[in-house]
């Protein structure tokens, strides 16, 4: 499907979503604010200082700061653990069950335990978010490491490639699709946990604003904050991740009927 058709289908899906949203506001006006009410609240949020006399971009930046820092930590730790598990049978046999147990721990429990251990401040978030999302990255990279083609490694050794050169030119290119899958899953999970941390522990960030306006039952304003942060994530996906993925997978030939680049 070419970009024009994809753009049309995307626009159509957005219109359908907005239509369903408006229909929901008609059916249940006490629970779902209308599109126009949310748009009005959005304009107010974008132009008027909120609690503690802070503009919207302060809260978006604080949430993005925690999310991106913890995402980077999780990607490094998860990639190292995943590659180690996928390339070492002893480690895989010893630690695989612990990874699945780690995945089963509820994120909310991790947030509360971090708060008890460290305190009700931002440090708890910087601990809780990596703990919660690192196993998802590790699981993706583990599967990627298990699918590495050993013949490529043998060929690199035959031509005298060193360990670093093999890692950079043979292993990493094969793991790129799994790395981007890890980034997307970590981002989608990480922002939810970041908002939980802010809602329960902090007095700044998008999560705090959600809780603040939920407590006041200002649903239109709460929805406007959701629109702001979803827009931020869409920019990250299509403005950063998609172009980067296309660039890093440009060397891969397209299989018939399959698009490897977005």
Where on the chain are the PLM-derived regions?
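Generic hydrophobic transmembrane alpha-helix motif, especially the helices
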Residues: 100-136, 143-144
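Short cytosolic juxtamembrane segments of multi-pass membrane proteins
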Residues: 245-262
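Transmembrane-helix boundary motif in ABC transporter permease subunits
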Residues: 69-99
